[in-house]
Amino acid sequence: MNKFVKVDVTVQQKQLQPGATGQLLFSVKPGKGIHINIQPPLSITMDDDSSATLSGAMIFSTIKKDTLELLDSSKPIKQSFTLAKQMKPGTIFLKGSFIYFYCSDAEGWCSRFKQPFNVEVTVTP
């Protein structure tokens, strides 16, 4: 848990068939006086249980502040994933990590944070 930034992860499609593509949504809300850098790059990884793989590029909006390009936290980060074709019907959990760098506007410090996530998806026949 990061006391400076609140991250909520949801899945756009709660029910998917084996081999289907879904989308993870990352709501990133920095506290007052904190911003999220996009350099070094944001990173999303899935735990290695082979139930799903990331597909396509991460999609996010940015804003300019002076010479910096920052994450626009008013819009979610979107990352597509594809379920394995051999998935059996039932409930699964997509687990992984979201890595980002957050910084203090006033004090100038920055820190890396690895946010674990765990979202539920129902695999349908």
State the predicted function of each range.
Residues M1-P125:
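Extracellular/lumen-exposed scaffold segments
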